[in-house]
Amino acid sequence: MKDWAEGRACRPVFPLRISIEADSLQDHESQHLLRTTQHALDDLNDFSAHHLRLQISPPANGSVAVDGQSTGGEGEEVALIIRLLPGTETKADLQAYAPILDVYYTPNQVPSSSSSTSSLATYIANTLRDMFAEEQAMIAYLLSTSSSPPERIPKALAPEVAESLAKWTTRSIKYSRTYHLTFSLFTPTATPSSWEIEKALEDHMKPLLESFSPISNFTIDTQVQLYAQPGVSGAILKKQDLSAFINAAEWPLSPSIGGHPTINFLIYIGDMSVEGGGTSWLIPQWGGVIIQPDITDLRPAILTFSNQLMSLLGAPSSHSLPLRLNTLIRVRSAGLLLKASGTMGSLARLTVALPSISIPQSVADGVATTLFHLGKACDGLGGIEGLENARIAEEAAEKAFFEKSMVGQVYFPDEHKVAVYLPLLGPVGVPLVMGVVKEVKAWRKRRRGL
């Protein structure tokens, strides 16, 4: 258990494979470009837990992208496909709905076999570094806030980056295999009493939720609340008033349904706006709010809710949707693995600090389950299977640590035991003490008589 907590049992490593399609180049040219680009990438990377590995995609069967998942020429998953295409200028174009990066190059940029550097290789390496910089920073931040060994903790992040990532962790809702989404319409009057939310969700939200299916499932419900008054009033809402806008005492917003986390998305009918501009805002780990005068067009609101959902689930803020989802898988896997490992360490330290504490069989079973799935999560780190095993391990670790019978013992110090048992020992102790005193007096009397 301590080995997991101290990072000796598993070293989180994310070797991302990137496939290069270079059909326009000869074999020796593409191989030389790959080696040159790989050297440039290695020189730029100073974080050993997250590194990019290039490979050439065989032109015979090529690489394809299916449902946002890339496969190399031999069916292996890759994080990104780079397609090298001849052009009149050097530029990169990342496709919005596929993990494919089109890199255009000029003929004079193809490196010769005798050259050790290449402007094209440098350009590709810098582009890849920028694309995965946010993911690398996320994983580095998770490691820096865990109990990993000092040699595995990356160098300190820039203050502004660390601050941004701290807000990211505060904003993101806890990972769950299933989330419940509640879409609510609140109006201060009797109108509108209905809205075309089903069609809007079907057209603009369901495609996003389907793309999340490897990571999480979603259930949805909707509601309309009439004569709803917000917690604050006024035409201009100050930023410090936004958290009080939700009238929790009167608005029927369930915090959870069926044991799964609930994410609330709320449209309020009114003419109010936020100080400084804007009519929507995000509430960390809760949901999003939009104020608009009518509901004639729900498309902008649903698109805003989609962006807020991505933010609440912890997805990075840039690049194409498939890359953001794959990054989320890797980051969530690392976070759950580190959290479960830390919980195991806390449980081990607890048993050492309180040697008299009894360990129920359910806790022992939970520890065994956690360690088993931690091992499987470490082996499959970065993939769907690794994420699922990390989730099971984290849930089992939390359940074992907060076992109610053990919690009661932890918060039952020796002073409380004395207070409980002393009244019971009093009736027994007094006759014993008096009997001892009587026997001592009798012994002393007999001794004087001698």
Predicted segments, located by residue:
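Juxtamembrane extramembrane loops of integral membrane proteins
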Residues: 1-94
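Short, flexible coil/linker elements and helix-boundary hinge sites characteristic
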Residues: 7, 45, 53, 146-147, ...
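C-terminal membrane-proximal segments flanking the terminal transmembrane helix
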Residues: 67, 382, 386-387, 401, ...
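Extended, non-transmembrane interaction/recognition domains
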Residues: 90-342
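Short, flexible/disordered secondary-structure transition segments
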Residues: 219, 351, 404-411, 436, ...
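Membrane-proximal extracellular juxtamembrane segment immediately upstream
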Residues: 324-418
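C-terminal single-pass membrane-anchor helix
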Residues: 414-449
